[in-house]
Amino acid sequence: MKKRLIQSQYNKKKKLLEKYNHQYFNLDSPEISDSKYDQLKKDLIKLENTYTFLKSKSSIQDQIGAPVLKKFKKIQHSIPMLSLSNTFNSEGMNDFINKIANYLNTKNINFDFSSELKIDGISASLTYKNKKLDCGVSRGDGKVGEVITENLKTIKDIPREIKAQDFPNEIEIRGEVFIKKNDFFYIKDKFANPRNAASGSLRQKNPEDTRKIPLKFIAYTFGFEKGLNINN
């Protein structure tokens, strides 16, 4: 009886999270705050970790983002585009530090951290072949993304061709598409917040609609590469 009750509670919470995922990632119109969304997801993960019978192929812990929209062509990421975890208290931070210590097999060592502000937008992947932008993809569900090359080409921060002499034959650049708050001020009547403005604008069917929004792009890492020489 207890198992059946737990499964029922889990299913209700999971269905609710799937609804919010669709609103957040596909409709760009969230119904709840980020903190409430994160708490609901943490509750589900805690249930999965406590009661192993809840885990399945559709486990919450394996889900990133939302399924891609049907209006875009799909493509599988060569390396999954994962999502950052978060915490809202010192307990979560201590857990993070302990995981690092265990991974490094070290104890009683003080860690030094460097940090940077997180830009809240929508993740994008840019593949360059022979220095030219060949394909642009959204994160999608982390495993499969949406091909949005023409939309990404409308962003001035994204070069269509790399001028550098020493550049790999093929490389995937990953980064964040976002909109500055002062730019968002002029279009705030159309979107709930800057993050939704970036996501909604980037996933327009017509690239010319994307061009009308002052989107920015910042790169933070690379995925796969062919011919990249790194000495350190």
Regions found by a protein language model. Give the residues of each.
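RNA/tRNA-interacting regions in translation and RNA-turnover enzymes
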Residues: 1-232
